[in-house]
Curated annotation (Swiss-Prot):
This is Glutamate--cysteine ligase EgtA. Its EC number is 6.3.2.2. Belongs to the glutamate--cysteine ligase type 2 family. EgtA subfamily. It comes from Mycolicibacterium smegmatis (strain ATCC 700084 / mc(2)155) (Mycobacterium smegmatis). It catalyses: L-cysteine + L-glutamate + ATP = gamma-L-glutamyl-L-cysteine + ADP + phosphate + H(+). PANTHER family: GLUTAMATE--CYSTEINE LIGASE, CHLOROPLASTIC. Pfam families: GCS2. Catalyzes the synthesis of gamma-glutamylcysteine (gamma-GC). This compound is used as substrate for the biosynthesis of the low-molecular thiol compound ergothioneine. One of its GO terms (molecular function) is glutamate-cysteine ligase activity. GO terms for biological process: ergothioneine biosynthetic process; glutathione biosynthetic process. InterPro entries: EgtA_Actinobacteria (IPR017809), GCL_bact_plant (IPR035434), GCS2 (IPR006336), Gln_synth/guanido_kin_cat_dom (IPR014746). It comes from the Bacteria. Keywords: ATP-binding, Ligase, Nucleotide-binding.
Length: 423
């Protein structure tokens, strides 16, 4: 998410689109990359807390100073800071989930140690349970996003999304072209079940919300043209459906050094067709490519598949969650069984976020999915898979464990314990 606004550079004059049809062709040609499956890239976001005062939000300068002193990360992850000060590790692609998990674990250990040296802790929860929303990242992109959400009547949800949510993102190869439709359909169909399994955000701003995944609830409060699922009724041509989705979505900002916000509703298609003029011109390929980074569907085509619907979950569980999702998509036998198991709940996004595994249909699907992964898990992930399987068997999401901790100790104490790594 932490991408800078950029403008076209070089001596050549950028070529502007002359129609939405031309823009659609550009999207379709670059949405998914034909090739084998097997590579896995992981990203994990963690809320940053002051160990002495969990109600205080560390400043941008403070976070920047800590990150500047982080030694080279052994797994090659990139460190970025989210709008509200959450710290993200973005790992490069590795061959298979085990290598990707091991690399991210190593990088997270180095990062946590440096933050702990500054009396700061990194907490894996889907939402910040304690502090009010507030932006600390001064980037022009995020200022423009704030203004867009305010103008569109979603200021509260927009602020929560930007400054109080965190996730584990799984990036997988798109695979061979002839399997794109089935693969993208399954990535969507797994969403509600995986949300129920990993739901880890029962609180926001100091209050229980009544939802297991408040993070997913926040995304649902934003406009579906920007944050809803990409696939339509059939899902037979994901590249074309992504193009339609992107062209219908409103432009959030004009891609310029100042990241000028667009505060009226202008679908990208209208800009490309000339029905609306932004920045005194029609859009270029750079404008379109940047527009795509402002769209946040649960499964986003980026030549690969960026799967965005998992809550940030504890260190003991996220390796198993990552392995489960990857296995259900990359192992053909597991994929076939998972598609059948999740069919009854394939569109139950809100129900999964609200009820988690207490919903019997989601629980049934979750049991099948986790068992499929556990049967294929390597010895290195046995402990994490055992914990995840036990949690699912007991119809408990990580949100239940955190809620119990809050009830027993209070919010601030519970957060402090997690920030210190006390389980």
């Amino acid at each position: 998410m932490a991408l800078p606004a950029r403008s076209d550079s070089g001596c050549a004059v950028p070529v502007e689109f002359t129609s939405a049809e031309q823009a659609a062709a550009h999207i379709g040609a670059n949405s998914l990359q034909d090739g084998p499956i097997g590579r896995v890239g992981l990203e994990i976001e963690a809320h940053c807390f002051d160990l002495s005062n969990p109600t205080r939000r560390p400043s941008w300068d403070e976070l920047s100073a800590v990150i500047a002193d982080v030694p080279p990360l052994p797994g090659g992850s990139r460190i970025t800071v989210e709008p509200g000060g959450a710290v993200e590790l973005s790992g490069p692609p590795y061959d298979g989930p085990l290598a990707a998990v091991a690399a991210l674990q190593a990088d997270r250990a180095v990062l946590r140690a440096e933050f702990a040296r500054r009396n700061l802790g990194l907490v894996l929860l889907g939402t910040d349970p304690l502090r009010p929303t507030r932006r600390v990242n001064p980037g022009a992109r995020y200022s423009a996003m704030e203004q867009f959400f305010t103008a569109s009547g979603t200021a509260e949800a927009g602020a929560a999304m930007m400054t109080a949510t965190a996730s584990v993102q799984v990036n997988l190869d798109a695979g061979p072209r002839d399997g794109w439709a089935e693969r993208v359909r399954l990535a969507h169909a797994l969403g509600p079940t995986m949300i129920a399994i990993t739901a880890n955000s029962p609180m926001l701003g100091g209050q229980f919300t009544g939802w297991c995944s408040t993070r997913q609830r926040v995304w649902g409060q934003l406009d579906s043209a920007r944050c809803g699922p990409v696939l339509g009724v059939d899902g037979d041509d994901p590249a074309s459906e992504w193009a339609r989705y992107a062209l219908r979505a409103p432009v959030m900002l004009v891609n310029s050094p100042d990241a000028v916000p667009v505060t009226n509703w202008v679908p990208f298609a209208d800009w490309a067709d000339g029905r609306a003029v932004l920045g005194g011109r029609r859009p270029t390929e750079a404008d379109l490519d940047y527009h795509l980074t402002t769209l946040f569907p649960p499964v986003r085509p980026r030549r690969w598949l960026e799967i965005r619907y998992l809550d940030s979950v504890p260190d003991a569980l996220w390796p198993a969650a990552v392995f489960t999702l990857t296995t259900l998509l990359d192992d053909p036998v597991a994929a076939e069984s998972a598609a059948e198991a999740t069919r009854p709940v394939a569109t139950a996004w809100d129900r999964a976020a609200r009820m988690g595994l207490t919903d019997r249909h989601l629980h049934t699907a979750a049991l099948t999915c986790v068992r499929l992964a556990a049967e294929r898990a390597p010895a290195e992930l046995e402990e994490s898979m055992t914990l995840l399987m036990r949690s699912v068997q007991q119809r408990r999401s990580p949100a239940d464990d955190f809620s119990d901790r809050v009830v027993a100790r209070g919010i601030a104490a519970a957060v402090r314990e997690l920030a210190k790594g006390e389980l």
